Amino acid sequence: MIPGELLIDDGEHELNAGRATVTVVVSNTGDRPVQIGSHYHFYEVNEALAFDREAARGFRLNIAAGTAVRFEPGQERTVELVELAGERIVYGFNGKVMGKL
């Protein structure tokens, strides 16, 4: 199995169905590339990424598990985020939440 690989039957399948999403414009203001994995709490990503952080609180990239998005220096792109599921308790990352959302 390859990380992010989906082994499913034929037909259409909607990922993250019924979960809230938000779209944000992200700019890499730094001088190094920044890569963000599929399940990283987007609110807590590298400070060199400029975007509406409050809108991203409790959300992650809406991409397949095991994949990532790379932001090159000076690059601006629009990404879709999906709400975190489960108990919505966040520990670690950059230590900005350390508890329930």
Curated annotation (Swiss-Prot):
Pfam families on file: Urease_beta (PF00699)
Superkingdom to which the source organism belongs: Bacteria
Major localisation: cytoplasm
Chemical reaction(s) catalysed: urea + 2 H2O + H(+) = hydrogencarbonate + 2 NH4(+)
Keywords: Cytoplasm, Hydrolase
CDD domains documented for this protein: Urease_beta
Hydrolase in keyword set: yes
Location of this chain's protein in the cell: Cytoplasm
InterPro entries: Urease_beta-like (IPR002019), Urease_betasu_sf (IPR036461), Urease_subunit (IPR050069)
Molecular function as annotated in GO: urease activity
Pathway the protein acts in: Nitrogen metabolism; urea degradation; CO(2) and NH(3) from urea (urease route): step 1/1
Listed EC numbers: 3.5.1.5
Record GO biological process: urea catabolic process
PANTHER family: UREASE (PTHR33569:SF1)
HAMAP family with a match to the protein in the record: Urease_beta (MF_01954)
Oligomer and partners: Heterotrimer of UreA (gamma), UreB (beta) and UreC (alpha) subunits. Three heterotrimers associate to form the active enzyme.
Family: Belongs to the urease beta subunit family.
NCBIfam families, sorted: PRK13203.1, urease_beta
Name of this protein: Urease subunit beta
Organism field: Paraburkholderia phytofirmans (strain DSM 17436 / LMG 22146 / PsJN) (Burkholderia phytofirmans)
Gene name, Swiss-Prot/TrEMBL: ureB
